[in-house]
């Protein structure tokens, strides 16, 4: 069957000139053909993500058209403004895919608001809400290597699409022939017909105003003398991040020249992920990923070296800074709420408790943090939300968008650094003070990759075996509790393919398949009297679980 589909593509008059040579090159190679055509990229709550190329299991204009027709069919049942917002990052073909999606929507009579240049995830989420759209599309593969691209879908609240909506869109995609089933007009035709319009300056200004309103100590940075080295990792963060930092008074910004301008090949950093040290090894301090929803920093240590701050550590530092600062300034709301994912550090729970903040723990995926904001909004209590984070370098400190935002993350990190500098301290010193107060937590993530067509089956088999044969001990420590998030009646959260093992010494191990990549991730949390003890515990646990996950 996949050979028939391959032959159909080979015979078709394809508009993308890059696809024909690829199809010709793999002729007669059953393994290569099967990899491209045996399955289709699956549309889920995170949309699509895959390697660029020809076939149903690749990202190309035909797969984008098919997905967008499915989305359009759903939008047409939703009433409202019949409008979709679109943005895109610097990845290869992101602009082409964005305009392709706009053409499909316009052909279906759906209005489009698209950014006139690349803009990040938070800008897309904001525009979706600002224009009261039915949906939003962000063309990006986030932090994946350069050969990938993707398509994130958002609901009318600016949050990533719900399970129910994504299931309907997926069903509509299944009804749409990938090569011929989508309605389509050119981008120029859509503009001429008045169906496609660019996002206005009023929307961009409103976004910047909303971000800057969340400063904890407004005006501090104008006199702090903070010097910053910044890299947008050749992505979409350059304009919004520097705009906000300049507005708040940080003007001494050195941009890493090799990583300043959009470049989908990411030639200086093959894996443009701000949690990978390669992205920060040029001696810089701050980096945002290509779609600017995540931000990482390297802080300067007393000996002049740089140390990468983990996503968990930065989440705790920002929570601590926001709480202390808002209490000091009298801007802390009554009954404040913070939100984090279940795989993020329990140190944040201890910090929240210290400041009298309710900490809510949700499933992995920032949409669940957005869901908590929506619940507060529905109750007329959205001002209670002060901060949300995930260990994977995603932060949000306001309800103006419903996805992680590296722009506000960058702003608050810089403000925090400026504040500690102004009192003769540093981010590094404050982190050590937090550990001294609450205990030396260590949080580490390991990943096990399962490539190829059989990868997903292998992952499913491993997860099922862990449920059929529950672990009773790890590294000589008894497992005192197994929490299976596939049992919502026990967790109080929606069902998810996550297992958490709590050990007798207080350590935890979380095992979950990645939602976007063929990986099983393990999250280790250990607590020791010092870093060496916590690291030794983690190493022992990692060694014990590795053979189980291979």
Regions found by a protein language model. Name each.
Residues 32-37, 41, 149-279:
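Gly/Ser/Thr-enriched, mixed-charge loops and adjacent short helices
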Residues 37-57, 141-142, 228, 232-244, ...:
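Conserved phosphate/anionic-ligand binding catalytic regions in large, soluble enzymes, centered on
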Residues 282-284, 288, 305-307, 325-512, ...:
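Phosphate-binding and adjacent anionic-ligand microenvironments
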């Amino acid at each position: 069957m996949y050979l028939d589909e391959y032959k159909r593509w080979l015979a078709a008059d394809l508009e993308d000139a890059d696809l024909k040579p690829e199809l010709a090159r793999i002729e007669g190679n059953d393994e290569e053909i099967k990899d491209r055509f045996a399955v289709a990229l699956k549309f889920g709550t995170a949309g699509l993500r895959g390697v660029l190329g020809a076939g149903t299991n690749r990202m190309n204009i035909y797969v984008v058209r098919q997905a967008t027709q499915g989305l359009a069919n759903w939008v047409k049942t939703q009433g409202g403004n019949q409008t979709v917002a679109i943005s895109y990052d610097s990845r290869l073909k992101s602009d082409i895919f964005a305009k392709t999606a706009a053409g499909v929507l316009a052909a279906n009579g759906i209005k489009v608001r698209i950014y006139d240049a690349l803009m990040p995830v938070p800008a897309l989420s904001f525009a979706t809400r600002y224009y009261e759209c039915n949906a939003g599309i962000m063309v990006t593969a986030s932090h994946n290597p350069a050969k990938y691209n993707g398509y994130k879908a958002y609901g009318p609240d600016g949050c990533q699409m719900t399970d129910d909506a994504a299931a309907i869109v997926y069903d509509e995609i299944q009804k749409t022939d990938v090569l011929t089933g989508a309605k389509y007009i050119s981008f120029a035709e859509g503009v001429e017909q008045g169906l496609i319009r660019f996002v206005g300056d009023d929307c961009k200004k409103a976004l910047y105003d909303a971000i800057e309103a969340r400063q904890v100590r407004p005006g501090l940075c104008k006199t702090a003398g903070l010097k910053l080295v910044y890299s947008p990792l050749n992505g979409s963060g350059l304009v919004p991040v520097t705009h906000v930092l300049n507005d708040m008074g940080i003007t001494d910004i050195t941009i890493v020249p090799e990583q300043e301008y959009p470049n989908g090949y990411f030639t200086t950093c093959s894996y443009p992920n701000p949690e990978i040290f390669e992205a920060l090894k040029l001696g810089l301090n701050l980096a945002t990923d290509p779609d600017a929803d995540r931000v990482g920093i390297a802080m300067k240590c007393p000996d002049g070296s740089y140390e990468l701050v983990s996503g968990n550590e930065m989440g705790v530092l920002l929570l601590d800074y926001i709480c202390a600062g808002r209490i000091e300034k009298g801007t802390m709301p009554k009954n404040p709420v913070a939100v984090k994912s279940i795989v993020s550090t329990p140190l944040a729970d201890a910090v929240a408790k210290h400041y009298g903040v309710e900490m809510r723990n949700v499933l992995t995926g920032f949409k669940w943090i957005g869901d908590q904001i929506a619940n507060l909004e529905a109750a007329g209590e959205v001002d209670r939300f002060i901060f949300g984070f995930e260990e994977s370098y995603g932060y949000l400190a306001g309800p103006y968008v419903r996805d992680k935002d590296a722009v506000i993350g960058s702003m608050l990190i810089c403000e925090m650094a400026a504040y500690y500098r102004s009192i003769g301290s540093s981010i590094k010193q404050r982190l050590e003070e937090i550990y001294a107060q609450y205990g030396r937590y260590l949080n580490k993530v390991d990943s096990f990759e399962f490539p190829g067509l059989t990868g997903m089956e292998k992952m499913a088999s491993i997860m099922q075996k862990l449920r059929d044969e529950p672990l009773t001990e790890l590294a000589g420590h008894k497992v005192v509790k197994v929490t299976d998030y596939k049992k919502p009646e026990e967790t109080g959260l929606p069902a998810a393919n996550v297992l958490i093992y709590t050990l007798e010494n207080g350590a935890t191990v979380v095992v979950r398949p990645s939602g976007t990549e063929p990986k099983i991730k393990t999250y280790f949390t250990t607590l020791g009297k010092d870093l060496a003890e916590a690291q030794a515990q983690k190493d022992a646990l990692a060694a014990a679980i590795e053979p189980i996950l291979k």
